[in-house]
């Protein structure tokens, strides 16, 4: 049985118990504590999760996809909050989170990609978003390392970046300074009493009581034992492999902004950090819980990145990682109360977890203090997914620790 080895079996109480200590769980806990709520977080390794793999693009405009326009308003609202959010978090934690207002350049490498990018530009304009169409020559003038074959691109000055690892570390520190209590253990099962969520039982046997419970366990959110079937979040893991390279001083500046493209139908992006790190990603694989870094995944990312920026083959490869994105059926998050009183969800953010961190924290804090979601978050309430019929004999799940 997995446990931290330092918990007791006595019941401990709080106003809010957050299950999951990734960036979504941490921002929820931080905001709740700022509102005066006694808050606790359960996670064996708080600050970990998908943020340790993510690139940190804040791409409300360039992440717009057909069929996902519902998500646009939430993405734009969160992106607009990022400058103030970053400043507040850095002041609260004393740590730099690597927020850079550097912009993004999305480019096309052939005529088909160019036509697709033109369609995306038209969709952005119809949606009231700011983006500028550039010729291939104009793209290379902005980023000289781009391949000569670039046929055109979209310049989006409002899509920025943040370092997710620094973001997670800063949120952890801010939570600790705000008085959030951490239980570094696995949750064995949800606690339910008198028809409402009442806390959790940890792997070490500790019973945690809480007036409200927030399930923010990322891709594991649907695996928590004790969840009634009608409130199990429809969240699945989507594997993503990511590479990190280092730009030696002799090659700097390699890129000045995030560069992204679609190569042979696969999305690839290159995110330059101020410290010389270059993040290349990401695969999108329906592989269940597998987090193996594969030769094929590394090859595909380097091959596509090389077509975009040929000079990348000269850079040292310093890290290969794979993580799991928590995806919902419509690729949008689940935010808000469930059919089980006292249980709320903050999960299913898929590829937008870093971008949606500010608005998620604000929305969950408002829910926890007033009982109501703000208008911007209401379209993402869990009730939009009707639960599947279940036999009466299997009304409570028996699953793995979350």
Regions found by a protein language model. Give the residues of each.
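C-terminal catalytic lobe of FAD-dependent flavoproteins
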Residues: 309-402
């Amino acid at each position: 049985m997995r446990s931290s080895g330092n918990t007791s079996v006595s019941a401990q109480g709080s106003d809010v118990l957050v299950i999951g200590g990734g960036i979504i769980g941490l921002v929820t806990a931080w905001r709740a504590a700022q509102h005066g709520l006694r808050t606790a977080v359960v996670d064996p390794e708080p600050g970990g999760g998908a943020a340790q793999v993510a690139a940190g693009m804040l791409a409300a405009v360039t992440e717009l996809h057909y069929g996902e326009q519902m998500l646009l308003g939430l993405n734009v609202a969160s992106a607009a909050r990022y400058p103030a959010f970053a400043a507040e978090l850095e002041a609260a934690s004393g740590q730099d989170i690597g927020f850079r207002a550097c912009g993004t350049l999305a480019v096309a490498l052939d005529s088909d990609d160019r036509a697709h990018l033109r369609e995306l530009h038209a969709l952005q304009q119809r949606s009231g978003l700011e983006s500028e169409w550039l010729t291939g020559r104009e793209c290379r003038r902005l980023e000289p390392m781009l391949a000569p074959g670039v046929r055109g691109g979209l310049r989006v000055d409002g899509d920025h970046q943040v370092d997710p690892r620094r973001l997670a570390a800063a949120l952890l520190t801010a939570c600790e300074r705000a008085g959030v209590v951490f239980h570094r253990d696995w949750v064995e099962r949800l606690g339910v009493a008198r028809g409402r969520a009442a806390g959790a039982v940890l792997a070490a046997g500790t019973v945690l009581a809480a007036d409200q419970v927030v399930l923010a366990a990322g891709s594991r959110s649907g695996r928590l034992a004790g969840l009634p079937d009608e409130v199990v979040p429809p969240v699945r893991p989507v594997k993503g492999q990511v590479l990190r390279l280092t730009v030696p001083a002799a090659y700097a500046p390699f890129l000045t902004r995030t560069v992204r493209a679609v190569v042979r139908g696969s999305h690839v992006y290159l995110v330059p950090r101020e410290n010389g790190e270059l993040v290349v990603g990401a695969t999108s694989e329906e592989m269940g819980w597998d987090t193996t870094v594969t030769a094929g995944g590394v090859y595909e990312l380097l091959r596509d990145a090389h077509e975009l920026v040929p000079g990348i083959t000269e850079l040292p490869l310093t890290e290969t990682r794979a993580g799991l994105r928590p995806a919902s059926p419509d690729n949008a998050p689940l935010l808000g109360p469930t059919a089980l009183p006292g249980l709320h969800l903050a999960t299913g953010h898929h590829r937008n977890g870093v971008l949606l961190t500010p608005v998620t924290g604000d929305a969950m804090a408002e829910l926890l203090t007033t009982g109501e979601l703000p208008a911007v978050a209401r379209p993402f309430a869990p009730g939009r997914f009707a639960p599947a019929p279940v036999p009466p004999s299997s009304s409570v799940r028996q699953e793995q620790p979350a």
